[in-house]
Amino acid sequence: MSRALSLLAGAALGCALAGPATAQDAPKGDAANGKKVYLADGCYFCHGRVGQGGAYNGPAPVLAKTEMPFEGFKGQLRQPAQDMPAYSEAVMSDQQIADIYAFVQSLPGRRDPKSIAILNN
């Protein structure tokens, strides 16, 4: 076997043994600090004080109990797909984003209307 073919086979074997690439683990977030950042940076104008969503400048998604993984959440803050302002690393650190993520994960989320007594009388 030629030297080039041996190197190629070795590289392929190394890649196979390395396993699949995984997303970097999210920094551990602090929900209490996340609430402070969420309120201080005005996230609530569009997303509501408890992440319930809203329509301040067009429809804003519900953030409470979001099923979006951290990397997607961070990506949306860094390079938003909609009319949301972008938050560069100079404006908001990855740790602050992790804190906001922890905060919105701590919110109760939507309740089933059938579980609200006043709506069912």
Regions found by a protein language model. Give the residues of each.
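Gly/Gly-Pro-rich "capping" loops immediately C-terminal to redox-active cysteine motifs
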Residues: 31, 35, 39, 48-86
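Bacterial N-terminal signal peptides that target proteins for export
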Residues: 1-9
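Juxtamembrane/transmembrane-helix boundary motifs in multi-pass membrane proteins
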Residues: 2, 28-32
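Bacterial N-terminal signal peptides
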Residues: 8-16
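Flexible coil segments in periplasmic/lumen-exposed cytochrome c-class electron-transfer proteins
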Residues: 24-29, 40-41, 49, 86-121
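Short, cysteine/histidine-rich loop/knuckle motifs that typically chelate Zn2+
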Residues: 45
